[in-house]
């Protein structure tokens, strides 16, 4: 499968290029960076320190998408909307690992998915998606009046959105387990005099620092006991490999908006 990596000079872009080179069932077709990037017209190998790849880095989407079958996208929300439009027009598979979308942007992506196959997830790893399944089951089983839910995440100092897409994915799982809307029960910050914790809310706490790839934990705090579920990402390759798995899966599926739960066969479990 021929693939284009967008946002290629970012951490995940570089990881995706490396992951593609290690496999025989996918091929790096093009590499796209932002307009005016100093990497334009250089060989893609400069991004990974690998041997010469004979793929010229471009900042022109038309050029990058002219001979590809799929787009691997861990960029920024505004850019992802642009790429989703291209994907819909050209019937290209679009794998979206970008996070931080607004409600309006989410609606646009859903609309574009009518004309192409999109897999969108706040986290592409098997472990996190299994964790989400467990979180939903736990939230459903534990009484709201007895157990409070708190989600904690930590990422590297360069991450620009909070809570992370993964934290929100886990929060959504917990909310679905309790049959409520996350937006109605989430508490994203506590500061100063907050009063007592409101029953049924789902709290989020975020930290940024160092080179942390991604730590997430979900605590169900009840009377005299706590249940803690967690996931630690040690290397970004787990996200890259998940994205490639999603692309190959999407190639053989009808137009629509899917998640990694679909790709991993966890939808029914979830």
Swiss-Prot record:
NAD(+) binds at residues 7-12, 97-99, 121-124. The active site is at 155 (proton donor/acceptor), 159 (proton donor). Its EC number is 1.17.1.8. Pfam families: DapB_C, DapB_N. (S)-2,3,4,5-tetrahydrodipicolinate binds at residues 156, 165-166. Its main location: cytoplasm. Signal peptide: none annotated. One of its GO terms (biological process) is lysine biosynthetic process via diaminopimelate. Pathway: Amino-acid biosynthesis; L-lysine biosynthesis via DAP pathway; (S)-tetrahydrodipicolinate from L-aspartate: step 4/4. The keyword Translocase does not apply. It catalyses: (S)-2,3,4,5-tetrahydrodipicolinate + NAD(+) + H2O = (2S,4S)-4-hydroxy-2,3,4,5-tetrahydrodipicolinate + NADH + H(+); (S)-2,3,4,5-tetrahydrodipicolinate + NADP(+) + H2O = (2S,4S)-4-hydroxy-2,3,4,5-tetrahydrodipicolinate + NADPH + H(+). One of its GO terms (molecular function) is NAD binding. GO terms for cellular component: cytosol. It is found in: Cytoplasm. NADP(+) binds at residue 34. The keyword Hydrolase does not apply. Keywords: Amino-acid biosynthesis, Cytoplasm, Diaminopimelate biosynthesis, Lysine biosynthesis, NAD, NADP, Oxidoreductase. Belongs to the DapB family. NCBIfam families: dapB. Catalyzes the conversion of 4-hydroxy-tetrahydrodipicolinate (HTPA) to tetrahydrodipicolinate. This is 4-hydroxy-tetrahydrodipicolinate reductase. The gene is dapB.
